[in-house]
Amino acid sequence: MKLRKLITVLFIGLFFSLHAQQEDANKILEKSLSQAKKENKNVLLIFHASWCGWCKKMEKNLNSDAVKPLIDKNYIPTYVSVQERGENIKKYENPNGQDLMNKYQGKEAGLPFWVMLDAKGNVLDNSFDKNKENIGCPASPEEVSEFRDKLQKTSSLTASQLQTIYDNFVQKKS
């Protein structure tokens, strides 16, 4: 009888863990802003999706051995999953993520879309270029230059560090 009860409890626990929602986007941002205040940093808020190839490239570049310590010294990188499809909606998407993206003018931007915020949540910059087009994951020399300029404006990165980031992001042509 005890074994039967144990199996039932385990089954129910497994069921709920499989159907658990991701964390609310506003709570994610709230935690990041709190951490940014404590550490005297800005927040790099990145909206992405599991199906988005450019999002994966952006994450890979930001997490490369050369770039990650530079970004982490100046920002709290924060990811919010939006625009998931099918079964991935429940599996990956953060509730209220799209509303948060819309709040920062990213409704029609495409992915990835990112915003640089100060520790109070004020927008310092975003992924729109001078022509109001989303850079997304910068890859061309022009896009990466614009990204570098935004980093320079919102961080204490040195010219040498900014060049390291530029070199890691610029798309190499074979």
Predicted regions and their residues:
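A short beta-strand-turn-helix
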Residues: A25-V43
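Extracellular/periplasmic catalytic domains that process cell-envelope and extracellular macromolecules
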Residues: K37-K38, P69-D72, G106-G110
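Non-catalytic, surface beta->alpha helical segment in thiol-disulfide oxidoreductase systems
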Residues: N102-Q161
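Bacterial Sec-dependent N-terminal signal peptides
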Residues: M1-E23
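Short active-site neighborhood of thiol/selenol oxidoreductases, capturing the structured segment around
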Residues: E39-G53, P77
